[in-house]
Structure formats: C-alpha cells, structure tokens
Amino acid sequence: MIKKLLLLILFSQIIISCSTKKFSDEATKKIYPVERFGQLNRSVLDSVLKNSGNISIDSNKPLVIIYYPGKDKCNSSGSSTRRSTKVWYNKMEKGINKIEPSNIVYVYKDSTDLFERHDGFKDWKRDPNKVIEKTFFKTHPPCGGYILISDSGRYISHLAEFDKKFLWQRLEQLIN
C-alpha cells in the first residue's frame, strides 16, 4: 500500500513538472518560461527592422518573426533535409496567411550552419543590433523560436523548437 502511494505521488510530480512549460538553462541553473506574453510599442520595433534590417513591414498586419539563434545541439541534429525544411516553412507560411495575412520575417543571430538547410528559399536577415534577442529572449532559445506581434503591439514569444500548428493556434489567440 505504501509503495503504491509513493508511486502515485512520484507519478503526479512527474506529470506536474512535465506540464509546466519551462526551459532550464543548465549553465546558470535558471528556469525560464518557454512562452512570454506582453505588450510593446510596435511602431518602434517596425522602425528598427525597416531601417536597420532593411525589412519591409506593413504595420497594419501581424508580424511573425522566425528566429534562428545559431548552431546548437538541437538545431544541428535531426533528419530533416533541405527539401523537407522548405516544405515545412512553406506550409507554415500558408497556414499563417490563411489565419491572417501577416508579415513573416526570418531573423538570425549567428548564421553558422543556417544556410546548410535553409539556403535559397527564405530571406534570412541578421538581427539588427540584436534587438530581437534583447527584447524577446533572455537566454539562448534551443533550436530557435518565434515571436508573434499583433498590429497593436501585443506579443507572444516562444523560446524553443516549435510545431507550426502550435504557432497557428497562438496566432489565432493573439488576433482574436
């Protein structure tokens, strides 16, 4: 009976810890939320991206930023090919624009290994003055991440590898 009770307690702790969306930075032993929600001045961000990053943005549409932090253990492994990656990004963009026509911007911090899988089919821009990293990511996002920003400046940032369907759900949540 005691063994069953202890197993039940252990199992419930595992379920609770697995359902909490957090990311652990092993180097500093800090825990960061995988998602952050907030509000920012959209016109300032648009201005920085337009002027420093030479990125065309329609301020009346949501802004979707796909972020590549540089090579890490997560994004340098796996079995995706250039072709499968291209198909994945195209489906993601189609789904985004089906929900709401949007500005979709691809931004990188460090291009190491970026153009091995992504070259030739997306226009990746360097993070101008590290504004995306400093504003949205307090630590290195493993694999990458995304930021969804409404025309009014409400945002959701996601720190880590993501599924395009989850991104679509968050975009619907943001614009509704």
Predicted feature residues:
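Thioredoxin-like thiol-disulfide oxidoreductase module
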Residues: 111-142
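Start-of-domain marker
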Residues: 19-61
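Generic short beta-strand
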Residues: 145-146
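Solvent-exposed loop/turn segments at secondary-structure junctions
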Residues: 13, 70-73, 111-114, 154-155
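Bacterial Sec-dependent N-terminal signal peptides
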Residues: 1-28
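Structural microenvironment flanking redox-active thiols in thiol-disulfide oxidoreductases
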Residues: 75-115
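Short active-site neighborhood of thiol/selenol oxidoreductases, capturing the structured segment around
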Residues: 55-77
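Thiol-/selenol-based redox modules, centered on thioredoxin-like
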Residues: 151-155, 160-176
